[in-house]
Amino acid sequence: TVRKRIQQLESEGVIKGYSAHIDYQRSGYPLRMMLFCTASIPERGDLVSDILAIDGVVSVQELVTGEQNLLVTAVGESDSDITPVAQELLDMGLTIADEVLVRSHEATPFGEFKTD
């Protein structure tokens, strides 16, 4: 059954938890900005929790290829909400190589998990 399969994936650590799928546009935070950053490689992993603690940051991804090795996503009501995020990243010693304004974001779960 589906329930047993989910329980199996949870016990194997494949499913680590559940989160809400938030429509930031409808919640009053229409601006979504991706900031491509560079951190020193020894510090990169240690910085993730500090970056997530910055007000407005909703995700951090470690990148393993290219010069930019952290992708920070922040949301806000306006540009003035994103500027403090960028400043805090700079204060942490990160370099911001690029900023990208996101118009929309859609996702789907990976559908290739095999059943026994």
Which residues make up each language-model segment?
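A compositional/biophysical signature of low hydrophobicity enriched in polar/charged and small residues
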Residues: 1-116
